[in-house]
Regions:
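Phosphate/nucleotide-donor binding subsite
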Residues: 58-73
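Membrane-proximal helix-turn-helix segments that form the acceptor-binding/catalytic region
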Residues: 80-85, 124-125, 139-151
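Short, flexible, mixed-charge acidic loops at enzyme active sites
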Residues: 48-54, 129-135
Length: 151
């Protein structure tokens, strides 16, 4: 099966993603990893430990909008186009999402209702309550952990 893992960070960085991908590959699956690059000059396609890495450019400014993913849909719409391309180009049969901030982008891009696993590594809405930028005056106006909780 062609599994598309979705990570909204550069790769390789997170050992959990590598470990899960390796386990899936060892079980006979093809793993394609959607990830982002903040650099304009990057290797778009790569193979690392049998993981087919597909990098997409994301500006730092756009990435900062991921903090507003469930308040304003900018990040969702920009990333969903990239994810839609990834799904079609690689003929993905199952999606595996690693981060809540990109989940709405994946759901928006998944026009053919490919089976999807949402594998959250942390309880982001609870953690957000301790983030300095969420507790700032502007953060309290723009970022709602409650909206993330119901997402």
């Amino acid at each position: 099966m062609k599994i598309g893992m979705i990570l909204d960070a550069p790769f390789p960085t997170d050992p959990r993603v590598s470990n899960e991908a390796s386990a899936l590959i060892n079980s006979g699956h093809d793993v394609f990893l959607f990830c982002i690059s903040f650099k304009k000059d990057f290797k778009r396609n790569d193979i690392l430990n049998s993981i087919k890495v597909k990098r997409y450019y994301c500006s730092n400014l756009l990435y900062k909008f991921s903090a507003l993913a469930y308040t304003f849909p900018f990040y969702k719409y920009f990333m969903s186009r990239k994810i839609s391309h990834f799904i079609k180009e690689n003929e993905i049969e199952h999606l595996h999402i690693h981060d809540i901030q990109i989940a709405s982008s994946v759901f928006h891009a998944n026009k053919t209702n490919i089976p999807t696993t949402l594998d959250l590594h942390e309880n982001r809405p609870e953690i957000m309550k301790f983030y300095k930028h969420v507790n700032s005056n502007l953060g309290k106006i723009l970022i709602s952990p409650q909206k993330w909780k119901i997402a």
